[in-house]
């Protein structure tokens, strides 16, 4: 979209099925929000430009989570907007904060199955 330069990225974590989804979601959403707060104003500005150009109101971009079942277990998808010019830095900060939360939360750490994955979110 002209005059906007943000996209969506996802960080996925596979957790065992005995994970408490509510506490895991709460902890990881808080982690994402703490990183997002550092660049939220830039996303909000671009969002406002998009609304003016399109002459339509859209929900403000913000981090969110969803659960899905996979063959490997229960997958938590943490989706967040990134400023394209700073996407690598934002992904690094997001990964570090999520891993810090996992490392300091014994239940979450014990339920982590496999390696977290980072990807650009492309939706049809």
Segments predicted by a language model, with ranges:
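A membrane-cytosol interface segment of integral membrane proteins
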Residues: 1-41
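Solvent-exposed, non-transmembrane regulatory segments of membrane-associated proteins
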Residues: 19, 29-124
């Amino acid at each position: 979209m002209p005059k906007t330069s943000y996209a969506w990225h996802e960080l996925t974590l596979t957790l065992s099925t005995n994970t408490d989804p509510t506490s895991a979601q709460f902890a990881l959403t808080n982690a994402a929000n703490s990183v997002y707060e550092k660049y939220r104003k830039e996303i909000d500005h671009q969002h406002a430009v998009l609304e003016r150009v399109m002459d339509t109101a859209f929900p403000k971009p913000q981090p969110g989570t969803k659960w899905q079942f996979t063959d490997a277990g229960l997958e938590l998808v943490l989706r967040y907007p990134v400023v394209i010019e700073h996407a690598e830095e934002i992904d690094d900060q997001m990964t570090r904060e999520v891993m810090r939360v996992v490392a300091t939360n014994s239940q979450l750490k014990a339920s982590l199955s496999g390696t977290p994955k980072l990807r650009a979110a492309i939706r049809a």
